Amino acid sequence: MTDSSSASDPTAGPVDPGPAPSAPDPALEDPASTPANGHHPNQADSFNMEQQMKIGEPEDNAGLLESSMRLKPHEAQSYRKKALWVSWVSIVVTMILAIAAFTVSIMRHSASAFGFAFDATLDVLSSIIVLWRYSNAAAVHSAHREYIACVILGVVFILSAITILVKAIHDLATKLEPEVDDFLYSVSVISGVVCTVLCVCKFMLGKVLTSRALITDGFNSLVGGVMGFSILISAEVFKHEPSVWFLDGTIGILIGLIILAYGVKLLKDMVPRIRQTRHYERFE
């Protein structure tokens, strides 16, 4: 009677629903979601994790080239070996061409042949630098090593350009006329064809590996190919028009200026980058 009367009494106060249910503990619902150390991640931990992920990315100036994002490890090593093979072939072939061109320049008084001989010597040196650049398998993507190689190439370019310019200007000042024969033609054609083929191979590998050093080596081979054909052109022109004796020396000056400009630009671009990546020598 008491319960029914109290339930029907409109003046009675509200019934107490009891204590409110507490929010479930995530750790009790899913034990796997709790870290092993019992510590839940907070904002500081999330920030540290993001920072670590950024540090691990190859494009944050951490001393890696763009090729580290494009190539898989086995692909990078495959292209590295190809670059080494091309460099060895370039060293052997251009050394033979340099000796032949020096012989032609001495025997036939050709300024452009001398320029090509020096450029072939430069090609040998640049290929040796590329060999050093890719000698370490772990440093295939090392930007710091890449920039050092480019700076050395820039210095060699400038020194070679000065020598070529001095020789060409001297020949023009003394009105030295080149002598034309079959030996000169043979060296010119072989040099032009071989250097052009090497240039294409180096440019392709340099593009894949994003290597400025390989591209620079390819540019040097391109200059060698142009100079090889220029020897042929200037000799043929002089054979039919002796009054155009200055063409040979003029081409030598032009090539010297091109090499000089490229060397200066290389130093201007790469010296600041060496300073930026000097703390990232972990692959050396």
From Swiss-Prot:
InterPro entries registered for this protein in UniProt: Cation_efflux (IPR002524), Cation_efflux_TMD_sf (IPR027469), Tmem163 (IPR026765)
One MF annotation (Gene Ontology) recorded for this entry = zinc ion binding
**Knockout: what is the outcome?**
Morpholino tmem163b knockdown severely affects central nervous system development. Morphant larvae display locomotor disability, decreased survival, and myelin deficits associated with a reduced number of oligodendrocytes.
GO cellular component, alphabetical, reads: early endosome membrane; late endosome membrane; lysosomal membrane; plasma membrane; synaptic vesicle membrane
SUPFAM superfamilies tied to this protein: Cation efflux protein transmembrane domain-like
Where are the annotated segments for Disordered?
Answer: 1-44
Which Gene Ontology terms describe the biological processes this protein takes part in? myelination; oligodendrocyte development
Entry's transmembrane regions? 84-104, 112-132, 146-166, 183-203, 213-233, 244-264
The record, for Pfam families, names: Cation_efflux
**Membrane topology (UniProt):** Multi-pass membrane protein
Catalyzed reactions per annotation: Zn(2+)(in) = Zn(2+)(out)
Main localization of the protein described in the UniProt heading: membrane
Parts forming coiled coils? none
- Extracellular side stretches: 105-111, 167-182, 234-243
Keywords of the record, alphabetical order, are: Cell membrane, Cytoplasmic vesicle, Endosome, Lysosome, Membrane, Synapse, Transmembrane, Transmembrane helix, Transport, Zinc
Cytoplasmic compartment segments = 1-83, 133-145, 204-212, 265-284
| Location of this chain's protein in the cell | Cytoplasmic vesicle, Secretory vesicle, Synaptic vesicle membrane; Early endosome membrane; Late endosome membrane; Lysosome membrane
Give the family this protein belongs to, as stated in its UniProt record.
Belongs to the TMEM163 family.
> What is the role of this chain?
Zinc ion transporter that mediates zinc efflux and plays a crucial role in intracellular zinc homeostasis. Binds the divalent cations Zn(2+), Ni(2+), and to a minor extent Cu(2+). Is a functional modulator of P2X purinoceptors, including P2RX1, P2RX3, P2RX4 and P2RX7. Plays a role in central nervous system development and is required for myelination, and survival and proliferation of oligodendrocytes.
Q: What is this protein called?
A: Transmembrane protein 163b
Q: Which organism is it from?
A: Danio rerio
Give me the gene this protein comes from: tmem163b
